[in-house]
Amino acid sequence: MSSIEGPVRVRFAPSPTGSLHIGGVRTALFNWLCARHYGGQFILRIEDTDEKRFVPGAADDISASLRWVGIDWDEGPDVGGPYGPYVQSERFEQGIYQPFINQLLEAGLAYMSFTTEEELAQMRAAAEAAGIKAFRFRGPERDWPLERQREEAASGKPYTIRLKTPLEGETRFRDLIRGGDEIVVQNNQLQDIVLIKSTGMPVYHFAHLVDDHLMKITHVMRGEEWVPSTPYHVLLYDFFGWPRPVFAHLPAILRQDGRGKLSKRKDDVATQRFRERGYLPETIFNYLALQGWSYDGVTEIMTRDELIARFTLERIQPSPARWNPEKLRDMNGIYIRKLTTEQLAERVLPFMQRAGLIGDPASETERAYLISLIPLIHERLEELQEAPDLLAFFYQDVVPGETYNPADLIPKKHDAAQTVALLRAAHEALSQQTDWTPPALETTLRALCEQLQVKPGPLFGAIRVAITGRSVAPPLFDTLAGVGRERSLSRLAAAIAALENLA
């Protein structure tokens, strides 16, 4: 897989700037699958050096989201490891980065820049006015001796530390996902990027690279938006004399219409939202594995173990993936139908509790009743959040004029008086029913249709609305059995009374 000797070590290194985007989970998943397939280690590292964008609690959200999907880590903030700490701010406090920036300064490969933000803005404006499309900053201090830089810093002037990029030549690197072809960048197209901010905090370009080296990361898998920054990272590896990792930049995930990338700012794609809507973690795991990777171009439903066995970096596609909410929803339905009745009841229970239909904690009676109802919705459910609405009439009163419009009871080609007659006959027949099971109820009601010489559709439709308040509901005989004898007869009586006022 690479020329690097030793075990595969990969990492997912998110910034705690908000809820974890589903695209971030895809990046974590590909790294995790790589580690598990090749028998290596997966490391979680929190990169919190951006103080302005830091969101308290975001790191915990990231960990919780990853664990929910089924991604665990061999080393990380909460599990430790031989190369900790695994939070960059903690590494900064321990002075881990300082020797390395000093090494670059001493070698003349980095320099202290005293250019202020205001001066930088003026330079950009002047370049734009002069028709220069790509402003590339190279500070005058790059030619100063280090002693002069230190004297200037000692005077109290704020400064950043910038990479001293070569003015000539070219920087080359390979990307595994792009066929391993060499990517060539002319050094005069680069600029002197900031490595250390004026606060002393290292930026991503510097901190992640030092961490990757010290943590012995062998493969850097990240989004393709980092391709333009990779020449700087390659220069730093070469300046330090460190072996480069294998670079594998993952394809973007586009919106369904193909117009732009999926965005956590514009699209409802926070991982927590999928959990709240009732997507199974197995679904998210499977679907995200297919966002830029394919086993054989045909097989889509794969278990966790199958994905581990089949995953290879060579089958990651360079072309963008496209997000398809309908396909994701369909896949969730498939995984829901793989669950047993008891398993689905357990998954649905929190949604029923949040809707106020079942107590928290649920009693054994409530659990048993929910399990009895699950078969009625098992084949129809696509998202777990749909369950409370589909099952509400089993738990709540159905009242004509409140739950439904009494006019909805009237079948096509019938009037109110005719419908009253149908429902009265049904009420009378069912009130004599002692065996309240679906087969017995079906026998009774079909016999009633023959007796009344009516088609089942109008009668069953009117009963369905009376019992559920809806024209579409689970199978009628199962519904009657689930609602129970007393409540069913009461609802039929209420429907008859409401219709009599219309007749």
Swiss-Prot record:
Keyword Zinc in annotation: no
Domain of life: Bacteria
Keywords: Aminoacyl-tRNA synthetase, ATP-binding, Cytoplasm, Ligase, Nucleotide-binding, Protein biosynthesis
Residue numbers covered by motif 'KMSKS' region: 261-265
Recorded catalytic activity of this chain's protein: tRNA(Glu) + L-glutamate + ATP = L-glutamyl-tRNA(Glu) + AMP + diphosphate
Keyword Repressor: no
SUPFAM superfamilies: An anticodon-binding domain of class I aminoacyl-tRNA synthetases (SSF48163), Nucleotidylyl transferase (SSF52374)
GO cellular component: cytosol
EC numbers on record: 6.1.1.17
One of the GO BP terms on file: glutamyl-tRNA aminoacylation
Binding, ATP: K264
Subcellular location: Cytoplasm
Classification via InterPro entries: aa-tRNA-synth_I_cd-bd, aa-tRNA-synth_I_codon-bd_sub2, aa-tRNA-synth_I_CS, aa_tRNA-synth_I_cd-bd_sf, Glu-tRNA-ligase_bac/mito, Glu-tRNA-synth_I_codon-bd_sub1, Glu/Gln-tRNA-synth, Glu/Gln-tRNA-synth_Ib_cat-dom
Sequence motif: 'HIGH' region, positions: 14-24
PANTHER family registered for this protein in UniProt: GLUTAMATE--TRNA LIGASE, GLUTAMATE--TRNA LIGASE, MITOCHONDRIAL-RELATED
Protein family according to the UniProt entry: Belongs to the class-I aminoacyl-tRNA synthetase family. Glutamate--tRNA ligase type 1 subfamily.
Function according to Swiss-Prot or TrEMBL: Catalyzes the attachment of glutamate to tRNA(Glu) in a two-step reaction: glutamate is first activated by ATP to form Glu-AMP and then transferred to the acceptor end of tRNA(Glu).
Stated name of the protein: Glutamate--tRNA ligase
Organism this protein belongs to: Chloroflexus aurantiacus (strain ATCC 29366 / DSM 635 / J-10-fl)
